[in-house]
């Protein structure tokens, strides 16, 4: 938020054109230097409307983030029906990392477009409307303008397409057509952005990579560091989403793999392992990866719904809320 005055001073066009250059990049906060310009632009737009103050900015961020409830419910409903959709929202609303970090970081607003693009993707799988594929590309474009973590969604779609080729050849052809249109839409967005503002996304990515490596290292300096960092990434995220939810998600995913090879959770499992061991992230993933919420809560909700055991559901919800409260206390006191 401290970078908003800089954008206000130089103007949007100059800010985008010179984002990766020294006169802008070196003036940014360390956090902004590891992100694309969308986050600062997002806050700048709302500061123009409501003024430059932390209270209105926090409220806008929370309200904007809360809209993810809609695509999460619609995604769960599209895949598994209304009952799973409702249960997914209940589990989502008590997910520790999302509750804690939505009001304390920009990763909440960053999660909106990746989650929306995921819903649109699965909606397009059962539809012939090309406009859905175009919207997927636009959502990914906006998501990538706010956080580089949106690359995870692109990788997930790729893994889904590969598994579709293996297990559902008919669906594969439709997925490829959808992703091709989405890719064209994505490229067109950044092509037009470059044409009108001279913003070079490749320069911005490279500058952010070098900034991150300077502070955190590459992650593969030694085999020991690589393995410990990658394993810690995975564990930090799975603990952050809530141990009870993680167990339910894991049981649900394994059940789907042993059964009909449901591609929604199985594609996520493969993608999660790849990203966790990619060294693209050096911890804090319990915050950065909160956009992965639907991939956890929806399979967990489906598993609990199929068990049809109220005692199990109450146990998962109670223990997750307990973990949330403990995390809140530790975050605001000990940590």
Question: Model-found features: residue ranges?
Answer:
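Membrane-lumen/periplasm interface segments of specific transmembrane helices
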Residues: 159-253
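Signature aromatic-anchored transmembrane alpha helix within multi-pass, membrane-resident enzymes
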Residues: 130, 182-187, 307-334
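Membrane-interface transmembrane helices that cradle and orient dolichyl/undecaprenyl
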Residues: 117-132, 304
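Transmembrane-helix motifs of polytopic, lipid-linked glycan transferases
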Residues: 55-79, 114-116, 120
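Membrane-interface alpha helices of multi-pass inner-membrane proteins
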Residues: 100, 132-159
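Short acidic/glycine- and proline-prone juxtamembrane loop motifs at membrane-interface regions
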Residues: 97, 102-110, 285-286
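Short hydrophobic/aromatic helix or loop-helix immediately within or flanking a transmembrane segment
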Residues: 25-51, 143
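Hydrophobic, aromatic-rich transmembrane alpha-helices
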Residues: 238-260, 265, 269-276, 298
